[in-house]
Amino acid sequence: MALMALDHTRDFFTIGPFDPRDVADPALFLTRWITHFCAPAFVLLSGLSAYLYGRGRGRAELSRFLLARGLWLILIEFTLINFAWGFDPSFYRGLGAGVIWVIGASMLVLAALIWLPRWPIAVIALGMIFGHNLVDGIRAEDLGAAGPLWRVLHDPGRIQITETFRIYTLYALIPWAGVMAAGCLLGPTMLQDPETRRRRLYQLGAAITAGFVLLRATNLYGDPAPWSMQATPLATILSFINTEKYPPSLLFLMMTLGPSLMLLAAFEHTRGWIAGGLATFGRVPFFYYVVHLYLIHALAIAAAFEMVGVLVARAPEIGLGLPGVYLAWLVVLALLYPLCRWFAGVKARRKEWWWSYL
């Protein structure tokens, strides 16, 4: 959650445009790269949460919950979230289908998958994750009337709705729905005794990470951009870990999910004020996500006004260097903590059914 705020703080506060696959500035690239772990972990844990919610409930009840929550998240993406990015109620530039959209859409897919036995779900989930790079060569612009659907499923980009209105898909459904289904399959492991659970998470995470290194080294499959030897060891490492997120390649998912599983095991019993603060954010992820976008955007406007006297959040000529971005990020976290702590307390005291959607 905290790393997600770093990525969005960088997006609003960095001077000039930034290509996330540009390794020319190692510090800026690594700042972006470390935040790659957020979306895969977020989607995986959403699937795990769905499994835990379904314990003691029938499949019909779980399916209804996933359908309702999925539609709710899609609605929030196209309203509150899109407004947070642009502060423009007309949405004249169009709408963006980001991570909240793909979590909601993946919940709709999972609402159907949970009616299947465990093994078919595993086959479908792994097929989505491991097999989707086989269709990288199919481009939406070559499919005619089916192009918009392919934009949603695998080839992110612009969907022109009318002459003046468009939707930008950023997160492709096929691989991300596979990750959510995999998170649901992880559920039984999380219910085992702590020692067994940690051991299996370490084993699974290490196996996935080792698989990433071996498969990436071959340059045979799993990412559209091969790595290559560079002039310096650092540049070579950056080339090796520079994998595709849009859509998330197999190697991108292995690179991020493997370490995430090991960190999940390592942090299970971590104590201290930092761990406590992160846990506070984690107790109210939906509230955190919505509020942090509004807060970062508002702070970016205030910073721009202070620097150049213009009420605009992002422009090529204004912004902060990387040290300033990290300082702004810490300010954002400090402001978010009391808000999330307050809301977590309110949510814990309220028992109405609709609180589960917040």
Give each language-model segment a name.
Residues 1-358:
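Alpha-helical transmembrane segments and their immediate juxtamembrane cytosolic regions
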